[in-house]
Amino acid sequence: MRAPFTTLLHRLAATQRGTLFLILTLSLTTAAHADTITISAAISLKDALTAIAKTFESESADKVEFNFGASGPLAAQIQQGAPVDAFISAANKQVDNLIKSGKADPTTRRVIVLNTLVLIVPTAAKNPPQSFADLTADRVGKIALGQPKTVPAGQYAMETLQNLKLADALSAKIVYGANVRQVLDYVVRNEVDAGMVYATDAKVAGDTVKVVATAPDSSHEPIEYPAVILTTATHQSAAMRFLTFLQSDPAKSIFISQGFVLPTGPTTQSRP
């Protein structure tokens, strides 16, 4: 009777070892397929993308690392070989240039969200401007904009001032920020009398700033956020999974809660 019992124990031990081996194999396989994606993105997307990435990571083995900043410098870094998998810009120009130089895959290009441009003032300001025309008043000293050459928000702001015939009259009052969040900080700290930022940035600032005017849509190029995967990406499949997730219902809910506008037409882009 002792021999069969010993044999049974050996079989149980072998089964346990096999089960443990299978668990370890599956764990290692899952880890092997988990990629860490590097995304360079416009800083105005920081709050929304950070929240979306948490949801994405909870549903995926992939991880996301962000490099936030002004779209111009981020695109320049990519042109110079920065190890990035995907790029989300606050304007089309930067993505156009990356595609022309062969750095980005045009077939992956898509519009993620839209935004609006607003004029904000410090909430605590006394007798602040109430419109774009008011910016010419003597009581208005400094007006903050993003640097038009490198910051899309600054580009849209300058287009607006030019189309409203105010750019020349306001040139001596303008203070340039390195990115749209720096412009927002200037207003929050009451270092300027007004600033031009995205509606989403004004929302982030809460009750520290007040929106006094919205730029007419006809006064500037549409504020689109195009995303694209780079041709040098080391995790192209994972990057595509993340870009696809950005157009999912959970991601859309987060974008809307942050004040972004969803595209109403086709999201894929084909540009000359």
Residue spans for each PLM region:
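Bacterial N-terminal signal peptides that target proteins for export
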Residues: R2-L20
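Short, intrinsically disordered, low-complexity terminal segments
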Residues: H10-R11, L28-A31
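Bacterial N-terminal signal peptides
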Residues: R17-T29
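Exported/periplasmic ABC-transporter solute-binding proteins
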Residues: A34-F68, G72-A82, F87-N92, D96-D105, ...
